[in-house]
């Protein structure tokens, strides 16, 4: 018998009790002594209190109601949505946090707590403060003086000065924007059948663009993922500094360890604490005056690193296939990408640039669940990858974020601007919304609509006939509002040059459509200064010059301004012809590319206008073959659009046809309980497509950094071509040759031997010792090591040597020293198996390796090389995870992923008990599971 009290203000969330519990009691029923009724279920254990989930009237009503399966199944994790306001441990022993998380106390003195209600749930506390440091240091005085001193430019430029200003960084602006997440989630507004049809149509659109079911792979190569990280970004809310500050001195092993721990944390339902910061950027003056500044929520490294393993491949395929479907994510603003976009949208007479607002925060769990469903549909079949995706997207929609006053709150809706696939996910949400609106229009009798659309994040551009224009302008706002997205479709134009898409206008220049920023935005690049560094100033002026192409007067202004600076810096702008080649032919000379390096940052405005640098890099790679470029140019400028692929941008409504040859019908491929009827129409045979010509390449361009390019001659490049050396001489995993020689000399002296005697008689025994016992410095505690002489004969003898001399001079580490003997160790192990006296490395048994032929890769100083098989790599990764201290996760061999095996089994078993189907298990999972059970039977300890 115990007293029960509610925990927190919400009596329907958790209650406290004092009944003694043990591990395994979670889920046990709480029974009232008075009437023997079940009043709740034990849920959590605490230090002095235990907690149970109460039986509420809402639960009783739900159990008594007739329920139906959702048409689009719910994919979010059942275990991660609610953290119940309790203290989160958050793996502080596994990541380099500098801030701690504290439990909430009864009284909270801060700003955020007063806003916590339906939209936010307080979870915990940490240290934080509002950053008021802006990336904009002020106006560029040289440009202001130039304008003021010029009678020619002063009346033209002065009205454009100040139209964009640095965003306001203050507490009022912070809460004005962050509270956009504090909106109720409306129920019953979505037409379920139309929504199901929309999701199926988007899947078909992606399939027609080249996506294949099961064709998206998880990537657990930590090196590839690390190379894709933005190292200039911050580590996260609970860390200090940028990623590059932490990783600059990190070894490969430390980077791999962090990746494995991050992936394991996502698998184990671990929550990260995300940043919620004000965005330092240029914004329209009227928004700055209204104190409207955008916030962004970014993922911490302990979530981001592992999350990229399961989202990057889909994202890269999505970028690669831009314009094969109704999206432009990944489009190149040079090389006539926008010309192809413009001409593909010139089928009907009206253009509508839809204006969306508060898109990220308006995304509901329903929409994000649909995005998750689409990703799972195309992901390779594996329960572990599925588990990671489910947990990740549950965390994205129900994010724990650190507010400016130190309160950690959990939101319950909206996408995060700093997660690894924000733009792709937002684009998918908008595609679903457009397909949903089309289905709603069809159900309302609008059968003759003809239209195309393209999306990029929250940017939407529609090309429609007269009837479709009327429906879009009169009905689409309300249709999309049913999904809680806010769009205005009032502005319609009969020329594509009137619309604005991704903060750019379409301009016809020499018969080619090019993207153009507004003039005042180009002036803002010159007006505002991010850095006083000469190279940064040059990059800003160059960026303005590139963006101004097409505005002859603006180009003249920038060139005159650059000439005024030539006495200090000399001439640094490319010629008009070189910039024209960049836009119209996709060709840039090395001098132009060198100038463009570092331009990206100064071209970014509030609507995610595409920067320059990435596009230039892509264009340079494709520019190796002039003939191929000529063919591409001829294709994209011909009178007729290239042969169509079925992409779904066109939403005309003829009768449904059969699916393409070789592809299975997909009417039942999304869900198990699909509905019948004529609501779902086959996008594949309705649409004409947009095909981006990819030039074939006969040669590959060579990228060099700007400074190196200054001295890049044919003779200099031949030096690189002729460079051939032993990789061991430069590989940082090995000790230097001098360190190896010093170790041999010091070890020989310490054991009272000559160097020759040490190498001939003692070193072979030491190699065998390290094979069996590893190179760990923990071995020094033993005081001695054993060597066997005359092995395999009647005179076999065990000899003890002092171990301290072997380690005292081992710099930088014993493992780095012994890597010089990696090949010898492999030979010794192989020969030992042939002779029937196998040398078994300690890591071989500890990691549960089953294949005897892989024993050499369980040796901790054997180095991986290009001849290794996939099995060898798998074994070495598996041994590495077991070697790193503090990790309780296991590596699934094929995926190189650290998992807490027992917790995963428990979660899967619990799901089966709840009626879920038996999980699919990869061969790697079964192998590791079998080895674990075998160790238990044999009594082998971890």
Swiss-Prot record:
Site annotation Cleavage: residues: 108-109, 606-607
Keyword rRNA-binding appears in the UniProt entry: no
UniProt GO BP: DNA-templated transcription; proteolysis; viral RNA genome replication
InterPro entries named in the record: DNA/RNA_pol_sf, Peptidase_S1_PA, Peptidase_S1_PA_chymotrypsin, Poty_coat, Potyv_NIa-pro_dom, Rev_trsase/Diguanyl_cyclase, RNA-dir_pol_C, RNA-dir_pol_PSvirus
GO molecular function: cysteine-type peptidase activity; nucleotide binding; RNA binding; RNA-directed RNA polymerase activity
PROSITE patterns assigned to the protein according to its UniProt record, in alphabetical order: POTYVIRUS_NIA_PRO, RDRP_SSRNA_POS
Transmembrane segments: none
Cleaved signal peptide residues: none
Catalyzed reaction equations: RNA(n) + a ribonucleoside 5'-triphosphate = RNA(n+1) + diphosphate; Hydrolyzes glutaminyl bonds, and activity is further restricted by preferences for the amino acids in P6 - P1' that vary with the species of potyvirus, e.g. Glu-Xaa-Xaa-Tyr-Xaa-Gln-|-(Ser or Gly) for the enzyme from tobacco etch virus. The natural substrate is the viral polyprotein, but other proteins and oligopeptides containing the appropriate consensus sequence are also cleaved
Assigned keywords, A-Z: Capsid protein, Hydrolase, Nucleotide-binding, Nucleotidyltransferase, Protease, RNA-directed RNA polymerase, Thiol protease, Transferase, Viral RNA replication, Virion
Protein name: Genome polyprotein
Protein's organism: Brome streak virus (strain German) (BStV)
């Amino acid at each position: 018998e115990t007293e029960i009290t509610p925990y927190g203000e919400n009596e329907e969330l958790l209650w406290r009790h004092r009944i003694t519990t043990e591990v395994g009691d979670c889920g046990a029923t709480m029974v009232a002594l008075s009437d023997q009724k079940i009043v709740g279920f034990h849920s959590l254990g605490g230090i002095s209190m235990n907690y149970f989930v109460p039986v509420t009237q809402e639960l009783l009503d739900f159990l008594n109601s007739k329920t139906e399966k959702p048409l689009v199944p719910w994919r979010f994790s059942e275990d991660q949505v609610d953290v119940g306001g309790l203290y989160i441990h958050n793996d502080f022993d596994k990541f380099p946090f500098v801030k701690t998380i504290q439990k909430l106390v009864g009284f909270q003195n801060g700003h955020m707590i007063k806003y916590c209600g339906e939209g936010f749930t307080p979870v915990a506390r940490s240290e934080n403060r509002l950053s008021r440091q802006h990336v904009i240091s002020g106006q560029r005085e040289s440009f202001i003086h130039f304008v003021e001193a010029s009678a020619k430019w002063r009346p033209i430029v002065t009205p454009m000065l100040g139209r964009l200003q640095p965003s306001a960084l203050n507490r009022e602006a912070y809460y004005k924007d962050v509270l956009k997440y504090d909106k109720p989630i409306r129920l019953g507004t979505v037409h379920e059948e139309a929504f199901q049809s929309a999701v199926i149509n988007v899947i078909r659109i992606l399939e027609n663009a080249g996506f294949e079911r099961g064709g998206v792979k998880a990537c657990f190569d930590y090196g590839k993922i690390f190379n894709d990280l933005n190292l200039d970004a911050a580590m996260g809310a609970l860390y200090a500094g940028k990623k590059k500050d932490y990783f600059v001195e990190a070894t490969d092993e430390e980077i791999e360890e962090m990746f494995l721990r991050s992936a394991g944390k996502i698998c184990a339902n671990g929550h990260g604490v995300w940043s919620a910061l004000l965005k330092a950027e240029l914004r329209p003056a009227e928004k700055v005056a209204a104190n409207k500044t955008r916030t962004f929520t970014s993922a911490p490294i302990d979530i981001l690193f592992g999350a990229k393993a399961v989202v990057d491949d889909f994202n890269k395929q999505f970028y690669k296939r831009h314009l094969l479907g109704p999206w432009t994510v990944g489009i190149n603003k040079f090389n006539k990408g926008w010309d192809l976009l413009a001409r593909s949208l010139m089928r009907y007479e009206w253009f509508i640039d839809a204006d969306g607002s508060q898109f990220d925060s308006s995304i509901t769990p329903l929409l994000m669940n649909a995005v998750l469903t689409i990703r799972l549909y195309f992901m390779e079949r594996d329960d572990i990858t599925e588990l990671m995706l489910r947990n990740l997207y549950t965390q994205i929609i129900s994010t724990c974020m650190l507010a400016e006053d130190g309160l950690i709150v959990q939101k319950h809706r909206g996408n995060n601007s700093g997660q690894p696939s924000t733009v792709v996910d937002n684009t998918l949400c908008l595609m679903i919304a457009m397909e949903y609106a089309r289905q709603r229009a069809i159900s309302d009798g609008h059968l003759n609509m003809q239209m195309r659309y393209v999306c990029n994040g929250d940017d939407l551009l529609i090309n429609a006939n007269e009837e479709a224009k009327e429906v879009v302008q009169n009905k689409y706002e309300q249709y999309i509002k049913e999904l809680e997205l806010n769009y205005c479709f009032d502005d319609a134009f009969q020329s594509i040059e009137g619309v604005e898409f991704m903060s750019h206008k379409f301009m016809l220049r020499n018969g080619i459509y090019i993207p153009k920023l507004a003039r005042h935005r180009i002036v803002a690049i010159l007006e505002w200064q991010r850095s006083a560094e000469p190279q940064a100033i040059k990059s800003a002026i160059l960026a303005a010059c590139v963006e101004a192409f097409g505005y002859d007067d603006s180009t003249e202004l920038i060139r005159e301004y650059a000439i005024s600076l030539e006495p200090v810096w000399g001439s640094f702008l490319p010629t008009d012809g070189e910039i024209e080649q960049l836009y119209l032919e996709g060709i840039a000379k090395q001098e132009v590319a060198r100038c463009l390096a570092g331009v990206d940052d100064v071209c970014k405005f509030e609507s995610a206008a595409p920067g320059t640098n990435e596009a230039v890099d892509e264009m340079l790679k494709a520019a190796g073959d002039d003939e191929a470029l000529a063919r591409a140019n001829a294709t994209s400028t011909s009178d007729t659009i290239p042969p169509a692929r079925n992409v779904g941008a066109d939403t005309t409504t003829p009768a449904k046809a059969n699916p393409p040859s070789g592809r299975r019908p997909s009417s039942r491929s999304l869900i198990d309980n699909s509905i019948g009827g004529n609501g779902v129409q086959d996008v594949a045979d309705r649409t004409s497509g947009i095909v981006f010509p990819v030039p074939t390449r006969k040669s590959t361009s060579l990228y060099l950094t700007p400074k190196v390019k200054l001295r890049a001659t044919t003779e200099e490049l031949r030096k690189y071509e002729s460079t051939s050396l032993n990789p061991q001489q430069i590989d940082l995993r090995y000790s230097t040759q001098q360190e190896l020689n010093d170790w041999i000399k010091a070890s020989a002296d310490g054991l009272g031997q000559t160097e020759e005697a040490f190498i001939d008689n003692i070193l072979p025994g030491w190699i065998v010792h390290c094979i069996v016992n590893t190179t760990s410095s923990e071995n020094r505690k033993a005081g001695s090591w054993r060597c066997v002489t005359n092995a395999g004969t009647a005179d076999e003898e065990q000899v003890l040597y002092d171990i301290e001399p072997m380690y005292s001079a081992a710099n930088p580490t014993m493992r780095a020293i012994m890597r010089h003997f990696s090949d010898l160790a492999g030979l010794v192990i192989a020969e030992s198996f042939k002779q029937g006296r196998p040398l078994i490395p300690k890591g071989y048994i500890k990691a549960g390796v089953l294949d005897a032929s892989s024993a050499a890769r369980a040796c901790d100083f054997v180095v991986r090389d290009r001849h290794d098989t996939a099995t060898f790599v798998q074994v070495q990764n598996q041994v590495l995870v077991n070697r790193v201290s503090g990790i309780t996760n296991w590596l699934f061999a094929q995926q190189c992923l650290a998992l807490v095996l027992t917790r995963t089994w428990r979660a899967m078993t619990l799901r089966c008990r709840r009626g879920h189907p038996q999980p699919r298990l990869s061969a790697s999972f079964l192998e590791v599971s079998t080895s674990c059970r075998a160790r238990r039977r044999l009594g082998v300890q971890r």
